[in-house]
Amino acid sequence: MPEVVIPEYIIVHDGTPNNTRARNYTVRYRDYIKNVASSEIYATWPQSTIYANILAIQSFTLNRVYTEWYRSRGYDFTITSSTAYDHKWIPERNIFDTIDEAVDNIFNNYLSRPNVKQPILTQYCDGRQVSCPGLMTQWGSKALGDQGYTPIQILRNYYGNNMYINSTEQISGIPSSYPGAALRIGSRGNSVRTIQEQLNVISNAYPLIPKTAADGIFGEDTAEAVRTFQEIFDLTPDGIVGFNTWYKISALYVGVSQIAEYS
């Protein structure tokens, strides 16, 4: 795998690797990260602590994907739910709002070091029941967040100053990548046309969203369609297509398109 790619789905083995009775679950990547973070940390912790822990979870997970750690050893899954090997993951558990929003904001990020291609296997422990010298502790990261540390400061405190937050635009299951800057009234081009076309398809399933001309010009009609979409899906209703809104629209577009194909 030459590039880091965010998978659309991963396969979670709900047990230890050699437990042949454990079930495999096919889970959307973002839903998996939200589940793990909700299982591993507290939603009331400082925002910077939540982000630091999510980044560590994502980087660890993407390392498993990138290196094909289990598949290269003959297993038919991506990762396990056993904390002796991987993260805690609980089927069908509830997701906390603060974690849900944080993952949507940074799901394409991971941690890297200079001259190392793959995402870093950022191991961690809770720091109370288990100690792990040289690795991040969850309660320690909470204390640093309380002191005002930023996510990268928290991470570098444990993993060293040569740790960096990286990102990838390679996202499976998404037809077109985020253009790099928010789209708003006055924006023009193919990215605007993409959003207009996708919102028009989504409006077939969510008729409150007004249809708009797919002309590549971001006018008030497009802003209104975006605002309505944001209101329906609990996003900030500002009529601006930033990172979070772009990928939410893209994900819904794929889902609605697939439903249409099978209906």
Summary of predicted features, one role per range:
Residues 1-263:
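Conserved, single-site charged/polar hotspot
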